UniProtKB/Swiss-Prot annotation:
Family listed: Belongs to the IucA/IucC family.
Function: Involved in the biosynthesis of the siderophore staphyloferrin A. Catalyzes the ATP-dependent condensation of a citryl-D-ornithine intermediate, produced by SfnaD, and citrate to form staphyloferrin A.
Keywords, comma-separated and alphabetical: ATP-binding, Ligase, Nucleotide-binding
Source lineage: Bacteria, Bacillati, Bacillota, Bacilli, Bacillales
Protein name, UniProt field: Staphyloferrin A synthase
Gene Ontology molecular function, alphabetical: acid-amino acid ligase activity; ATP binding
Keyword ATP-binding included in the entry's annotation: yes
GO biological process: siderophore biosynthetic process
Pfam families according to UniProt: FhuF (PF06276), IucA_IucC (PF04183)
Keyword Cell inner membrane belongs to the record: no
EC number: 6.3.2.57
Organism, as annotated: Staphylococcus aureus (strain NCTC 8325 / PS 47)
Pathway: Siderophore biosynthesis
Catalytic activity: N(5)-[(S)-citryl]-D-ornithine + citrate + ATP = staphyloferrin A + AMP + diphosphate + H(+)
InterPro entries per the UniProt record, alphabetical: Aerobactin_biosyn_IucA/IucC_N, IucA/IucC-like_C, LucA/IucC-like
Length: 585
Protein backbone atom coordinates (compact mmCIF):
# COMPACT_ATOMS: atom_id res chain seq x y z
CA UNK A 1 0.00 0.00 0.00
CA UNK A 2 2.77 2.43 0.97
CA UNK A 3 4.56 1.78 -2.34
CA UNK A 4 1.35 2.51 -4.28
CA UNK A 5 0.99 5.85 -2.51
CA UNK A 6 4.66 6.67 -3.13
CA UNK A 7 4.34 5.78 -6.82
CA UNK A 8 1.12 7.81 -7.17
CA UNK A 9 2.68 10.90 -5.55
CA UNK A 10 5.92 10.57 -7.51
CA UNK A 11 4.08 10.27 -10.81
CA UNK A 12 1.81 13.21 -9.88
CA UNK A 13 4.81 15.53 -9.47
CA UNK A 14 6.44 14.17 -12.66
CA UNK A 15 3.23 15.02 -14.55
CA UNK A 16 3.12 18.52 -13.05
CA UNK A 17 6.73 19.15 -14.13
CA UNK A 18 6.01 17.99 -17.71
CA UNK A 19 2.79 20.06 -17.87
CA UNK A 20 4.68 23.14 -16.64
CA UNK A 21 7.48 22.63 -19.19
CA UNK A 22 4.94 22.49 -22.05
CA UNK A 23 2.69 25.29 -20.75
CA UNK A 24 5.47 27.68 -19.69
CA UNK A 25 7.72 26.79 -22.67
CA UNK A 26 10.67 25.97 -20.42
CA UNK A 27 12.94 24.46 -23.07
CA UNK A 28 15.68 25.46 -25.52
CA UNK A 29 14.72 26.80 -28.94
CA UNK A 30 15.70 23.61 -30.77
CA UNK A 31 13.10 21.61 -28.83
CA UNK A 32 10.10 20.25 -30.78
CA UNK A 33 6.82 19.38 -29.07
CA UNK A 34 4.30 17.39 -31.10
CA UNK A 35 1.13 15.42 -30.46
CA UNK A 36 0.64 12.09 -32.25
CA UNK A 37 -2.76 10.63 -31.44
CA UNK A 38 -2.95 10.43 -27.67
CA UNK A 39 0.83 10.81 -27.21
CA UNK A 40 2.85 13.98 -26.66
CA UNK A 41 6.52 13.96 -27.67
CA UNK A 42 9.16 16.39 -26.41
CA UNK A 43 12.21 16.10 -28.69
CA UNK A 44 15.59 17.76 -28.23
CA UNK A 45 18.31 16.60 -30.65
CA UNK A 46 18.55 12.79 -30.20
CA UNK A 47 16.47 12.73 -27.02
CA UNK A 48 12.69 12.16 -26.91
CA UNK A 49 10.30 12.06 -23.94
CA UNK A 50 6.86 10.56 -24.67
CA UNK A 51 3.79 10.65 -22.44
CA UNK A 52 0.17 9.59 -22.96
CA UNK A 53 -2.55 12.27 -22.69
CA UNK A 54 -5.96 11.33 -21.27
CA UNK A 55 -7.43 14.76 -21.95
CA UNK A 56 -6.53 18.40 -22.39
CA UNK A 57 -8.41 21.44 -21.07
CA UNK A 58 -8.19 25.19 -21.61
CA UNK A 59 -5.08 27.06 -20.44
CA UNK A 60 -2.79 24.18 -21.48
CA UNK A 61 -4.04 21.87 -18.74
CA UNK A 62 -3.20 18.21 -19.36
CA UNK A 63 -4.18 15.00 -17.67
CA UNK A 64 -1.57 12.30 -18.29
CA UNK A 65 -1.46 8.55 -17.69
CA UNK A 66 1.20 5.85 -17.53
CA UNK A 67 4.99 6.05 -17.36
CA UNK A 68 6.99 8.64 -19.26
CA UNK A 69 9.16 6.87 -21.84
CA UNK A 70 12.62 8.12 -22.77
CA UNK A 71 14.25 7.52 -26.15
CA UNK A 72 17.97 8.24 -25.89
CA UNK A 73 19.92 7.84 -29.14
CA UNK A 74 17.74 4.93 -30.24
CA UNK A 75 17.46 3.20 -26.84
CA UNK A 76 14.11 3.31 -25.01
CA UNK A 77 13.66 3.23 -21.22
CA UNK A 78 11.00 4.21 -18.68
CA UNK A 79 11.29 7.20 -16.37
CA UNK A 80 10.60 5.52 -13.02
CA UNK A 81 11.13 8.36 -10.53
CA UNK A 82 10.96 12.14 -10.25
CA UNK A 83 14.73 12.15 -9.63
CA UNK A 84 15.23 10.25 -12.89
CA UNK A 85 13.11 12.78 -14.79
CA UNK A 86 15.00 15.74 -13.31
CA UNK A 87 18.34 14.15 -14.25
CA UNK A 88 17.21 13.64 -17.86
CA UNK A 89 15.84 17.21 -18.15
CA UNK A 90 19.02 18.66 -16.68
CA UNK A 91 21.60 16.62 -18.55
CA UNK A 92 19.94 15.76 -21.88
CA UNK A 93 17.35 18.52 -22.49
CA UNK A 94 19.37 21.54 -21.29
CA UNK A 95 16.61 22.49 -18.85
CA UNK A 96 18.52 23.75 -15.80
CA UNK A 97 17.20 22.26 -12.55
CA UNK A 98 19.23 23.77 -9.70
CA UNK A 99 20.07 21.73 -6.59
CA UNK A 100 17.68 23.94 -4.60
CA UNK A 101 14.79 23.42 -7.05
CA UNK A 102 15.49 19.68 -7.09
CA UNK A 103 15.29 19.65 -3.28
CA UNK A 104 12.00 21.61 -3.39
CA UNK A 105 10.45 19.23 -5.93
CA UNK A 106 11.50 16.13 -3.98
CA UNK A 107 10.13 17.66 -0.76
CA UNK A 108 6.84 18.31 -2.58
CA UNK A 109 6.73 14.65 -3.67
CA UNK A 110 7.64 13.32 -0.22
CA UNK A 111 5.00 15.51 1.48
CA UNK A 112 2.42 14.34 -1.06
CA UNK A 113 3.29 10.72 -0.18
CA UNK A 114 2.51 11.52 3.47
CA UNK A 115 -0.76 13.16 2.41
CA UNK A 116 -1.85 10.16 0.34
CA UNK A 117 -0.99 7.80 3.22
CA UNK A 118 -3.08 9.97 5.54
CA UNK A 119 -6.06 10.04 3.15
CA UNK A 120 -5.95 6.22 2.86
CA UNK A 121 -5.77 5.91 6.64
CA UNK A 122 -8.77 8.23 7.04
CA UNK A 123 -10.77 6.26 4.52
CA UNK A 124 -10.08 3.04 6.45
CA UNK A 125 -11.11 4.65 9.75
CA UNK A 126 -14.30 6.05 8.24
CA UNK A 127 -15.39 2.73 6.70
CA UNK A 128 -14.73 1.04 10.05
CA UNK A 129 -16.77 3.69 11.87
CA UNK A 130 -19.71 3.09 9.51
CA UNK A 131 -19.81 -0.53 10.68
CA UNK A 132 -20.41 0.62 14.25
CA UNK A 133 -22.78 3.49 13.46
CA UNK A 134 -26.23 3.39 11.97
CA UNK A 135 -25.17 5.35 8.92
CA UNK A 136 -25.45 3.63 5.54
CA UNK A 137 -22.15 2.59 3.93
CA UNK A 138 -22.99 4.55 0.77
CA UNK A 139 -24.02 7.80 2.50
CA UNK A 140 -23.53 10.95 0.42
CA UNK A 141 -20.75 13.28 1.60
CA UNK A 142 -23.12 16.25 2.08
CA UNK A 143 -25.63 14.11 4.01
CA UNK A 144 -22.77 12.89 6.23
CA UNK A 145 -21.46 16.44 6.76
CA UNK A 146 -24.90 17.58 7.91
CA UNK A 147 -25.15 14.60 10.26
CA UNK A 148 -21.81 15.32 11.97
CA UNK A 149 -22.48 19.07 12.01
CA UNK A 150 -25.86 18.56 13.69
CA UNK A 151 -24.26 16.30 16.30
CA UNK A 152 -21.57 18.97 16.99
CA UNK A 153 -18.81 16.50 16.15
CA UNK A 154 -17.13 18.73 13.59
CA UNK A 155 -17.38 22.06 11.85
CA UNK A 156 -17.92 21.60 8.10
CA UNK A 157 -15.57 24.40 7.00
CA UNK A 158 -12.67 23.30 9.23
CA UNK A 159 -13.14 19.71 8.06
CA UNK A 160 -13.12 20.78 4.41
CA UNK A 161 -9.77 22.58 4.91
CA UNK A 162 -8.26 19.10 5.39
CA UNK A 163 -9.79 17.77 2.14
CA UNK A 164 -7.47 19.30 -0.44
CA UNK A 165 -4.82 16.58 -0.77
CA UNK A 166 -3.70 17.88 -4.18
CA UNK A 167 -3.05 21.40 -2.84
CA UNK A 168 -2.44 23.84 -5.69
CA UNK A 169 -3.96 22.12 -8.74
CA UNK A 170 -0.99 22.56 -11.14
CA UNK A 171 2.06 23.78 -9.19
CA UNK A 172 4.86 21.16 -9.06
CA UNK A 173 5.79 22.59 -5.63
CA UNK A 174 2.23 22.07 -4.37
CA UNK A 175 3.34 20.38 -1.14
CA UNK A 176 6.77 21.89 -0.57
CA UNK A 177 7.23 23.02 3.03
CA UNK A 178 10.98 23.37 3.43
CA UNK A 179 12.75 23.06 5.83
CA UNK A 180 10.06 21.06 7.68
CA UNK A 181 10.77 17.39 8.32
CA UNK A 182 8.10 14.85 7.36
CA UNK A 183 7.27 14.52 11.07
CA UNK A 184 6.65 18.29 11.19
CA UNK A 185 4.58 18.15 7.99
CA UNK A 186 2.38 15.52 9.68
CA UNK A 187 2.11 17.71 12.79
CA UNK A 188 1.22 20.99 11.07
CA UNK A 189 -0.29 20.47 7.58
CA UNK A 190 -4.10 20.77 7.40
CA UNK A 191 -4.79 17.33 5.89
CA UNK A 192 -3.55 15.68 9.10
CA UNK A 193 -6.29 17.39 11.17
CA UNK A 194 -4.05 17.83 14.21
CA UNK A 195 -4.89 20.18 17.08
CA UNK A 196 -2.04 22.69 17.11
CA UNK A 197 -1.28 24.64 20.31
CA UNK A 198 -0.32 28.25 19.54
CA UNK A 199 2.12 29.82 21.98
CA UNK A 200 1.00 32.95 23.80
CA UNK A 201 3.88 35.43 24.15
CA UNK A 202 3.85 38.92 25.68
CA UNK A 203 5.60 41.95 24.13
CA UNK A 204 6.38 45.15 26.01
CA UNK A 205 3.90 47.73 24.71
CA UNK A 206 6.53 50.19 23.37
CA UNK A 207 8.02 47.43 21.20
CA UNK A 208 4.85 46.35 19.38
CA UNK A 209 2.72 48.16 16.79
CA UNK A 210 -0.98 47.31 17.11
CA UNK A 211 -3.78 48.26 14.71
CA UNK A 212 -7.38 47.56 15.74
CA UNK A 213 -10.71 48.31 14.05
CA UNK A 214 -12.05 49.39 17.46
CA UNK A 215 -8.81 50.99 18.70
CA UNK A 216 -8.24 48.34 21.41
CA UNK A 217 -4.54 47.39 21.67
CA UNK A 218 -5.46 44.61 24.13
CA UNK A 219 -7.75 42.91 21.58
CA UNK A 220 -6.10 39.49 21.95
CA UNK A 221 -6.37 39.44 25.76
CA UNK A 222 -9.87 40.96 25.83
CA UNK A 223 -11.52 39.18 22.89
CA UNK A 224 -9.55 36.01 22.15
CA UNK A 225 -8.07 34.74 25.42
CA UNK A 226 -10.06 36.45 28.23
CA UNK A 227 -9.90 33.16 30.16
CA UNK A 228 -6.14 33.76 30.57
CA UNK A 229 -6.42 37.36 31.82
CA UNK A 230 -5.82 36.58 35.51
CA UNK A 231 -3.23 33.87 34.87
CA UNK A 232 -1.18 36.16 32.61
CA UNK A 233 -1.40 38.98 35.18
CA UNK A 234 -0.18 36.68 37.97
CA UNK A 235 2.53 35.18 35.73
CA UNK A 236 3.91 38.62 34.78
CA UNK A 237 3.71 39.77 38.40
CA UNK A 238 5.88 36.79 39.40
CA UNK A 239 8.52 38.23 37.03
CA UNK A 240 8.15 41.68 38.62
CA UNK A 241 6.23 42.99 35.58
CA UNK A 242 2.84 44.67 35.09
CA UNK A 243 0.32 43.17 32.65
CA UNK A 244 -0.81 46.64 31.47
CA UNK A 245 2.73 47.20 30.12
CA UNK A 246 2.48 44.19 27.77
CA UNK A 247 0.47 43.05 24.76
CA UNK A 248 -0.26 39.41 23.88
CA UNK A 249 0.82 37.92 20.55
CA UNK A 250 0.18 34.41 19.19
CA UNK A 251 3.04 32.37 17.74
CA UNK A 252 2.96 29.20 15.62
CA UNK A 253 4.74 26.34 17.46
CA UNK A 254 7.13 25.68 14.54
CA UNK A 255 8.09 29.35 14.54
CA UNK A 256 8.43 29.30 18.33
CA UNK A 257 10.77 26.29 18.20
CA UNK A 258 12.91 27.29 15.21
CA UNK A 259 12.84 31.05 14.67
CA UNK A 260 11.90 33.19 17.68
CA UNK A 261 15.03 32.35 19.69
CA UNK A 262 17.26 33.06 16.69
CA UNK A 263 15.82 36.52 16.01
CA UNK A 264 14.68 37.69 19.45
CA UNK A 265 17.17 36.23 21.94
CA UNK A 266 18.20 39.72 23.16
CA UNK A 267 14.55 40.78 23.62
CA UNK A 268 13.83 37.67 25.68
CA UNK A 269 16.91 38.33 27.86
CA UNK A 270 15.75 41.93 28.47
CA UNK A 271 12.15 40.84 29.18
CA UNK A 272 10.87 42.82 26.18
CA UNK A 273 9.48 39.54 24.80
CA UNK A 274 8.18 37.06 27.38
CA UNK A 275 7.53 33.37 26.65
CA UNK A 276 4.58 32.16 28.76
CA UNK A 277 3.47 28.63 29.68
CA UNK A 278 0.07 29.30 28.05
CA UNK A 279 -1.24 28.05 24.69
CA UNK A 280 -4.47 28.24 22.70
CA UNK A 281 -5.66 25.33 20.54
CA UNK A 282 -6.13 25.67 16.79
CA UNK A 283 -6.29 23.71 13.55
CA UNK A 284 -4.48 24.56 10.32
CA UNK A 285 -6.55 25.94 7.46
CA UNK A 286 -5.68 25.25 3.84
CA UNK A 287 -3.14 28.09 3.82
CA UNK A 288 -1.05 26.20 6.44
CA UNK A 289 -0.03 29.29 8.47
CA UNK A 290 -3.55 30.66 8.96
CA UNK A 291 -5.00 28.89 11.98
CA UNK A 292 -8.64 28.33 12.94
CA UNK A 293 -8.96 28.83 16.70
CA UNK A 294 -10.95 26.00 18.28
CA UNK A 295 -14.23 27.15 19.90
CA UNK A 296 -13.38 30.79 19.08
CA UNK A 297 -14.91 32.91 16.30
CA UNK A 298 -11.52 33.83 14.84
CA UNK A 299 -8.79 32.77 12.46
CA UNK A 300 -5.22 34.01 13.00
CA UNK A 301 -2.64 34.48 10.24
CA UNK A 302 0.87 33.80 11.54
CA UNK A 303 4.40 33.85 10.15
CA UNK A 304 6.08 30.49 9.59
CA UNK A 305 9.62 30.92 8.28
CA UNK A 306 9.25 28.07 5.81
CA UNK A 307 8.77 27.86 2.05
CA UNK A 308 5.26 26.69 1.20
CA UNK A 309 4.93 26.25 -2.61
CA UNK A 310 7.13 29.09 -3.93
CA UNK A 311 7.25 31.65 -1.13
CA UNK A 312 8.46 31.88 2.46
CA UNK A 313 5.33 32.37 4.56
CA UNK A 314 6.15 35.25 6.88
CA UNK A 315 3.73 38.15 7.57
CA UNK A 316 4.67 41.61 6.30
CA UNK A 317 4.25 44.41 8.83
CA UNK A 318 2.11 46.52 6.51
CA UNK A 319 -0.55 43.81 6.10
CA UNK A 320 -1.10 43.83 9.89
CA UNK A 321 -1.91 47.54 9.55
CA UNK A 322 -3.94 47.56 6.34
CA UNK A 323 -6.17 44.58 7.22
CA UNK A 324 -7.88 46.36 10.15
CA UNK A 325 -7.76 49.78 8.43
CA UNK A 326 -9.39 48.47 5.24
CA UNK A 327 -11.90 46.42 7.26
CA UNK A 328 -12.94 49.53 9.18
CA UNK A 329 -13.09 51.87 6.17
CA UNK A 330 -14.84 49.41 3.87
CA UNK A 331 -17.00 47.36 6.28
CA UNK A 332 -20.29 48.66 4.89
CA UNK A 333 -19.18 48.42 1.28
CA UNK A 334 -17.75 44.90 1.55
CA UNK A 335 -20.94 43.35 2.87
CA UNK A 336 -23.58 45.08 0.74
CA UNK A 337 -24.26 42.15 -1.60
CA UNK A 338 -26.65 39.43 -0.43
CA UNK A 339 -24.99 36.05 -0.73
CA UNK A 340 -21.48 37.54 -0.79
CA UNK A 341 -19.44 38.49 2.28
CA UNK A 342 -15.88 39.49 3.09
CA UNK A 343 -14.22 38.40 6.34
CA UNK A 344 -13.22 41.41 8.43
CA UNK A 345 -9.74 41.63 9.96
CA UNK A 346 -10.32 43.42 13.29
CA UNK A 347 -6.74 43.38 14.62
CA UNK A 348 -3.11 43.14 13.56
CA UNK A 349 0.24 43.62 15.29
CA UNK A 350 3.96 43.28 14.67
CA UNK A 351 7.19 43.55 16.64
CA UNK A 352 8.61 47.06 16.31
CA UNK A 353 12.02 46.16 14.89
CA UNK A 354 13.59 46.18 11.42
CA UNK A 355 11.26 44.79 8.75
CA UNK A 356 13.10 41.51 8.21
CA UNK A 357 12.82 40.53 11.87
CA UNK A 358 9.34 42.03 12.31
CA UNK A 359 8.02 39.67 9.59
CA UNK A 360 8.90 36.78 11.92
CA UNK A 361 6.82 38.04 14.88
CA UNK A 362 3.47 39.39 13.72
CA UNK A 363 -0.15 38.30 13.47
CA UNK A 364 -3.46 39.22 11.86
CA UNK A 365 -6.76 38.32 13.50
CA UNK A 366 -9.58 37.56 11.07
CA UNK A 367 -13.24 36.82 11.71
CA UNK A 368 -13.90 33.11 11.29
CA UNK A 369 -15.83 32.73 8.02
CA UNK A 370 -19.48 31.92 8.66
CA UNK A 371 -22.30 31.78 6.13
CA UNK A 372 -25.89 31.32 7.23
CA UNK A 373 -27.46 28.77 4.98
CA UNK A 374 -28.61 25.20 4.67
CA UNK A 375 -26.40 22.54 3.15
CA UNK A 376 -22.67 22.78 3.86
CA UNK A 377 -19.99 25.44 3.98
CA UNK A 378 -16.63 24.36 2.54
CA UNK A 379 -13.44 25.96 1.25
CA UNK A 380 -13.85 26.27 -2.53
CA UNK A 381 -10.57 24.44 -3.26
CA UNK A 382 -12.04 21.26 -1.78
CA UNK A 383 -14.70 21.10 -4.53
CA UNK A 384 -12.33 19.53 -7.07
CA UNK A 385 -10.83 17.01 -4.61
CA UNK A 386 -12.11 13.57 -3.57
CA UNK A 387 -13.66 13.17 -0.14
CA UNK A 388 -13.13 10.07 2.05
CA UNK A 389 -16.85 9.53 2.77
CA UNK A 390 -18.41 8.58 -0.58
CA UNK A 391 -15.00 8.71 -2.36
CA UNK A 392 -16.28 11.10 -5.00
CA UNK A 393 -15.07 14.55 -6.02
CA UNK A 394 -16.89 16.95 -3.70
CA UNK A 395 -18.67 18.97 -6.40
CA UNK A 396 -20.01 15.70 -7.87
CA UNK A 397 -21.23 14.67 -4.40
CA UNK A 398 -23.06 18.01 -4.21
CA UNK A 399 -24.87 17.40 -7.52
CA UNK A 400 -25.86 13.92 -6.33
CA UNK A 401 -27.02 15.32 -2.96
CA UNK A 402 -29.37 17.56 -4.98
CA UNK A 403 -30.70 14.37 -6.63
CA UNK A 404 -29.49 15.76 -9.95
CA UNK A 405 -26.72 13.31 -10.80
CA UNK A 406 -23.93 14.16 -13.23
CA UNK A 407 -25.85 15.38 -16.28
CA UNK A 408 -25.45 18.17 -18.80
CA UNK A 409 -28.30 20.05 -17.13
CA UNK A 410 -26.94 19.73 -13.58
CA UNK A 411 -23.40 20.75 -14.61
CA UNK A 412 -24.49 23.77 -16.65
CA UNK A 413 -26.88 24.89 -13.89
CA UNK A 414 -24.12 24.56 -11.29
CA UNK A 415 -21.57 26.55 -13.34
CA UNK A 416 -24.16 29.25 -14.04
CA UNK A 417 -25.27 29.59 -10.39
CA UNK A 418 -21.69 29.46 -9.11
CA UNK A 419 -20.57 32.17 -11.55
CA UNK A 420 -23.64 34.33 -10.85
CA UNK A 421 -23.00 34.24 -7.09
CA UNK A 422 -19.26 34.93 -7.38
CA UNK A 423 -18.58 37.19 -10.36
CA UNK A 424 -21.03 40.16 -10.24
CA UNK A 425 -20.06 41.35 -6.72
CA UNK A 426 -16.34 41.11 -7.55
CA UNK A 427 -16.75 43.11 -10.76
CA UNK A 428 -18.91 45.66 -8.89
CA UNK A 429 -16.07 46.13 -6.36
CA UNK A 430 -13.69 46.88 -9.25
CA UNK A 431 -16.05 49.35 -10.94
CA UNK A 432 -17.24 51.10 -7.78
CA UNK A 433 -14.15 51.02 -5.58
CA UNK A 434 -11.18 49.99 -7.72
CA UNK A 435 -10.61 46.88 -5.57
CA UNK A 436 -9.97 43.33 -6.78
CA UNK A 437 -10.23 40.85 -3.95
CA UNK A 438 -7.97 37.81 -4.37
CA UNK A 439 -10.92 35.44 -4.63
CA UNK A 440 -9.14 32.26 -5.72
CA UNK A 441 -10.25 28.87 -4.43
CA UNK A 442 -8.05 28.89 -1.31
CA UNK A 443 -9.37 32.30 -0.25
CA UNK A 444 -13.07 31.66 -0.84
CA UNK A 445 -15.54 29.80 1.30
CA UNK A 446 -18.74 28.60 -0.38
CA UNK A 447 -22.07 27.57 1.09
CA UNK A 448 -23.74 24.98 -1.14
CA UNK A 449 -27.40 24.70 -0.27
CA UNK A 450 -30.47 22.98 -1.69
CA UNK A 451 -31.84 24.04 -5.11
CA UNK A 452 -28.39 25.23 -6.29
CA UNK A 453 -28.43 28.01 -3.66
CA UNK A 454 -24.82 29.22 -3.54
CA UNK A 455 -23.27 31.90 -1.31
CA UNK A 456 -19.66 33.06 -0.94
CA UNK A 457 -17.33 34.57 1.60
CA UNK A 458 -13.88 35.88 0.66
CA UNK A 459 -11.10 35.88 3.26
CA UNK A 460 -7.65 37.50 3.31
CA UNK A 461 -7.58 41.17 2.32
CA UNK A 462 -3.78 40.98 2.03
CA UNK A 463 -3.82 39.69 -1.56
CA UNK A 464 -6.12 42.44 -2.89
CA UNK A 465 -5.11 44.90 -5.61
CA UNK A 466 -6.35 48.48 -5.40
CA UNK A 467 -6.59 51.33 -7.90
CA UNK A 468 -6.06 54.12 -5.38
CA UNK A 469 -7.62 56.87 -7.50
CA UNK A 470 -10.93 54.98 -7.82
CA UNK A 471 -10.99 54.04 -4.13
CA UNK A 472 -10.17 57.56 -2.89
CA UNK A 473 -12.97 58.90 -5.07
CA UNK A 474 -15.37 56.83 -2.89
CA UNK A 475 -13.49 56.82 0.45
CA UNK A 476 -11.55 60.09 0.41
CA UNK A 477 -9.58 59.75 3.66
CA UNK A 478 -8.30 56.19 3.16
CA UNK A 479 -4.55 55.60 3.47
CA UNK A 480 -2.86 52.39 2.28
CA UNK A 481 0.42 51.46 4.00
CA UNK A 482 1.23 48.41 1.88
CA UNK A 483 2.61 49.40 -1.52
CA UNK A 484 2.06 45.88 -2.87
CA UNK A 485 -1.72 46.39 -2.50
CA UNK A 486 -1.60 49.43 -4.78
CA UNK A 487 -1.79 48.56 -8.46
CA UNK A 488 0.09 50.50 -11.16
CA UNK A 489 -3.14 50.78 -13.15
CA UNK A 490 -6.71 49.54 -13.28
CA UNK A 491 -5.45 46.90 -15.74
CA UNK A 492 -3.44 45.26 -12.93
CA UNK A 493 -6.55 45.26 -10.71
CA UNK A 494 -8.58 43.51 -13.43
CA UNK A 495 -5.72 41.03 -14.01
CA UNK A 496 -5.89 40.03 -10.32
CA UNK A 497 -9.61 39.23 -10.74
CA UNK A 498 -8.92 37.38 -13.99
CA UNK A 499 -6.24 35.21 -12.39
CA UNK A 500 -8.20 34.37 -9.23
CA UNK A 501 -11.65 33.87 -10.74
CA UNK A 502 -11.41 32.99 -14.44
CA UNK A 503 -8.12 31.01 -14.35
CA UNK A 504 -8.43 29.48 -10.92
CA UNK A 505 -12.07 29.16 -9.83
CA UNK A 506 -13.96 28.74 -13.09
CA UNK A 507 -11.23 26.99 -15.12
CA UNK A 508 -10.62 24.46 -12.31
CA UNK A 509 -14.30 23.54 -12.06
CA UNK A 510 -14.63 23.36 -15.85
CA UNK A 511 -11.46 21.23 -16.10
CA UNK A 512 -13.06 18.78 -13.68
CA UNK A 513 -16.38 18.65 -15.58
CA UNK A 514 -14.55 18.42 -18.92
CA UNK A 515 -13.93 14.70 -18.24
CA UNK A 516 -17.65 13.96 -18.73
CA UNK A 517 -18.91 13.28 -22.25
CA UNK A 518 -22.26 14.98 -21.57
CA UNK A 519 -20.77 18.52 -21.61
CA UNK A 520 -18.46 20.55 -23.83
CA UNK A 521 -15.83 22.75 -22.22
CA UNK A 522 -16.62 25.62 -24.62
CA UNK A 523 -20.30 25.61 -23.56
CA UNK A 524 -19.31 26.00 -19.91
CA UNK A 525 -16.89 28.84 -20.65
CA UNK A 526 -19.63 30.51 -22.72
CA UNK A 527 -21.79 30.56 -19.58
CA UNK A 528 -18.94 32.25 -17.67
CA UNK A 529 -18.48 34.73 -20.53
CA UNK A 530 -22.19 35.65 -20.43
CA UNK A 531 -22.17 36.13 -16.64
CA UNK A 532 -19.08 38.38 -16.90
CA UNK A 533 -20.61 40.42 -19.76
CA UNK A 534 -23.84 40.89 -17.82
CA UNK A 535 -21.95 41.88 -14.65
CA UNK A 536 -20.05 44.76 -16.30
CA UNK A 537 -22.11 47.93 -15.90
CA UNK A 538 -21.49 50.15 -18.98
CA UNK A 539 -22.45 53.30 -17.02
CA UNK A 540 -19.78 52.78 -14.31
CA UNK A 541 -16.01 53.40 -14.46
CA UNK A 542 -13.61 50.89 -16.06
CA UNK A 543 -16.28 49.13 -18.19
CA UNK A 544 -14.14 49.33 -21.35
CA UNK A 545 -10.97 48.15 -19.60
CA UNK A 546 -12.87 45.20 -18.09
CA UNK A 547 -14.20 44.17 -21.51
CA UNK A 548 -10.84 44.63 -23.27
CA UNK A 549 -8.91 42.52 -20.75
CA UNK A 550 -11.48 39.88 -19.79
CA UNK A 551 -12.63 39.24 -23.38
CA UNK A 552 -9.24 39.80 -25.08
CA UNK A 553 -7.68 37.11 -27.30
CA UNK A 554 -5.13 35.99 -24.70
CA UNK A 555 -4.95 35.59 -20.95
CA UNK A 556 -1.84 36.27 -18.86
CA UNK A 557 -0.84 33.32 -16.68
CA UNK A 558 1.87 33.07 -14.02
CA UNK A 559 4.77 30.82 -15.02
CA UNK A 560 4.92 29.07 -11.66
CA UNK A 561 7.82 26.68 -12.30
CA UNK A 562 9.81 29.06 -14.48
CA UNK A 563 9.72 31.78 -11.83
CA UNK A 564 11.20 29.26 -9.37
CA UNK A 565 13.95 28.45 -11.86
CA UNK A 566 14.65 32.15 -12.31
CA UNK A 567 14.12 32.73 -8.56
CA UNK A 568 11.65 35.55 -9.23
CA UNK A 569 8.78 34.70 -6.92
CA UNK A 570 7.98 38.33 -6.16
CA UNK A 571 8.46 39.63 -9.73
CA UNK A 572 6.01 37.36 -11.47
CA UNK A 573 7.07 35.77 -14.75
CA UNK A 574 4.08 35.53 -17.07
CA UNK A 575 3.06 33.73 -20.24
CA UNK A 576 0.23 34.40 -22.67
CA UNK A 577 -2.31 31.65 -23.41
CA UNK A 578 -5.55 31.51 -25.41
CA UNK A 579 -8.36 33.16 -23.45
CA UNK A 580 -11.23 30.65 -23.02
CA UNK A 581 -13.80 33.49 -22.68
CA UNK A 582 -12.50 35.70 -25.52
CA UNK A 583 -15.04 37.44 -27.73
CA UNK A 584 -15.36 40.41 -30.05
CA UNK A 585 -15.90 43.53 -27.95
Amino acid sequence: MVYLEWAKADRNIQYRVINAIIKERIYPEQTFISQKGSLIEIQYHMHVLTIEVVRKSALERYEFTGDITYLNKGETSLIITLEGLLDVLNHDFDIPISERLREELIHSRDSLVETYKQMSHRQTLISQSFKFSRLPQDINFFSWLQHVKDSDKTDDLTYSESLVPEGHPTHPLTKTKLPLTMEEVRAYAPEFEKEIPLQIMMIEKDHVVCTAMDGNDQFIIDEIIPEYYNQIRVFLKSLGLKSEDYRAILVHPWQYDHTIGKYFEAWIAKKILIPTPFTILSKATLSFRTMSLIDKPYHVKLPVDAQATSAVRTVSTVTTVDGPKLSYALQNMLNQYPGFKVAMEPFGEYANVDKDRARQLACIIRQKPEIDGKGATVVSASLVNKNPIDQKVIVDSYLEWLNQGITKESITTFIERYAQALIPPLIAFIQNYGIALEAHMQNTVVNLGPHFDIQFLVRDLGGSRIDLETLQHRVSDIKITNDSLIADSIDAVIAKFQHAVIQNQMAELIHHFNQYDCVEETELFNIVQQVVAHAINPTLPHANELKDILFGPTITVKALLNMRMENKVKQYLNIELDNPIKKEV
